[in-house]
From Swiss-Prot:
The lineage of its organism: Archaea, Methanobacteriati, Methanobacteriota, Methanomada group, Methanococci. Residues 11-86 form the S1-like domain. This is Translation initiation factor 1A. Signal peptide: none annotated. Seems to be required for maximal rate of protein biosynthesis. Enhances ribosome dissociation into subunits and stabilizes the binding of the initiator Met-tRNA(I) to 40 S ribosomal subunits. It holds the Pfam family eIF-1a. It comes from Methanococcus maripaludis (strain C5 / ATCC BAA-1333). Belongs to the eIF-1A family. The gene is eIF1A. CDD domains: S1_IF1A. Keywords: Initiation factor, Protein biosynthesis. GO terms for molecular function: RNA binding; translation initiation factor activity.
């Protein structure tokens, strides 16, 4: 099957769960010490913390699309990064209209 592409299988993409207060965001700046600046889809700019279990599994870079959960205290200023999307998943989110806030 060299040179041929396998038929596309439906992709399963994790979307933000509103009942768990999850929000989509884009990483704007890496601040160091597991901290990032995230532009969220609700229009707020938050400082995000990358938990250790996520930091060890995947690398997060600027312009990555992520899911964040705002803190209960200081919810307009701080959040935790809980998921990072791959390029194919970002394309799917774009086609389905989840990333309208980025335009």
């Amino acid at each position: 099957m060299r040179g041929q592409q396998a038929p596309q299988q439906p992709t399963r993409v994790r979307t933000p769960r509103e009942n768990e207060n999850e929000v989509l965001g884009v990483i704007e700046q890496m601040l160091g010490a597991s901290r990032v600046r995230v532009r969220c889809m609700d229009g707020k700019l938050r400082m995000g913390r990358i938990p250790g279990k996520l930091k060890r599994k995947i690398w997060v870079r600027e312009d990555d699309v992520v899911i964040v959960t705002p803190w209960e205290v200081q919810s307009d200023e701080k959040c935790d990064v809980i998921w990072r999307y791959t390029k194919g998943q970002v394309d799917w989110l774009n086609r389905k209209g989840y990333l309208e806030f980025m335009r």
